[in-house]
Amino acid sequence: MHYAFSRIRLRSFFGWMIIGLFLTMIPLGLSNVSESTMEVISQITIFFVFPLFWLYVKTNKNNVVFNSFFDKPGRLPWGLIVLATIMGMIFSVGISHIQFYILAHTLPNFLVTMLEDGTVINTSNIYMTIFTFISACVLAPIMEEVIFRGFFLQRMAYKWGIKKAVIISSIIFGLGHFDVIGAFMFGVVMCLLYIKTKNIWTNIAVHALNNLIATSMQFVGGEESSAISIPELQLQSNLWIGIGLTVVGLLWLIPYVWKQWSTVKEVSVPPVRFINEEKVVSASPENEVYSQVIVTDRLMAVELPDEAVNKLRLEENDYVTVAVEDDKIVIKKVHDR
């Protein structure tokens, strides 16, 4: 848990995203640009540039090096990346089949309307086709992983603890996608993967590979289709295929989540670097951090600066040892007590 994120608030993010939406769409609506150009500019600005620029400004203001989100502490675990992608997609496809079956037999008219208005990749324009691939397989994975796993997870871990942070950030991630259940599970796996590897590039690789497969599948079914009838829709739905695929996906997802969940509090969120740490080479009166002494009826306490708390990765109810060495106080985190 990093106390720098105590001052970077979620409501600020959502508020500025709404402002960014208006700042982008109003000028575009008043201009004479084509529909495809408007789509490209709006998607890049609203869903990539604005969120990352906001986070860049906020992290720099709060002494966090923005580039530390992209630190690569080790080699990418390609075996885990491929396995997580495949099993996650199997689960998502299975859940989608189950939802499709339920809607086809309970709300068929709603499903027909949803499919007819659904997003199908337009292959008639080569430039839009290329942009769709870049947006889905490059821009979206980078933005979503940095925002949801890099920022949301850090902020929520500070506010509610790491386990609640995994759940709540994944719920928000799921609500932003059509397949809410599949996206929620994907979000949980991505959070645990980030905590385990401490490498956002692992998440970006899984996300990019997942989107590449999903986008390619859209291309396969991207041709214009005739009107969909309700009887035909109900015949196409297959509950047992959905159940089978979901079970296959869960055979890997449940053990993985269970194993990582049991150690998530001890491992905690990945560390970030601080601007002052990079600029300061040696201690001097100009860069000393002053801490306040607090006296109560029972004890005297010294407030630790954010840099010390983050360096030791301290959380509520953790224990530390305090030792006096010459004229210095040495504080160490106790891992086993």
Segments and roles (model prediction):
Residues N32-M38, N67-A140, Y158, S268-P271:
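Juxtamembrane helix-loop-helix connectors linking adjacent transmembrane helices
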Residues M1-F5, I41-I86, T106, I254-V269:
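Membrane-helix interface linkers and caps
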Residues P271-T296, E316-R337:
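Long, compositionally biased stretches
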Residues L139, I168-I172, A205, L209:
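Hydrophobic residues within alpha-helical transmembrane segments
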Residues M143-I168, L192-N199:
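Membrane-interface helix/loop boundary segments of multi-pass membrane proteins
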Residues L299-R313:
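Short beta-strand-centered segments at strand-helix junctions
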Residues A208-V281:
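C-terminal membrane module of polytopic membrane proteins
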Residues S12-N63:
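Alpha-helical transmembrane segments in multi-pass membrane proteins
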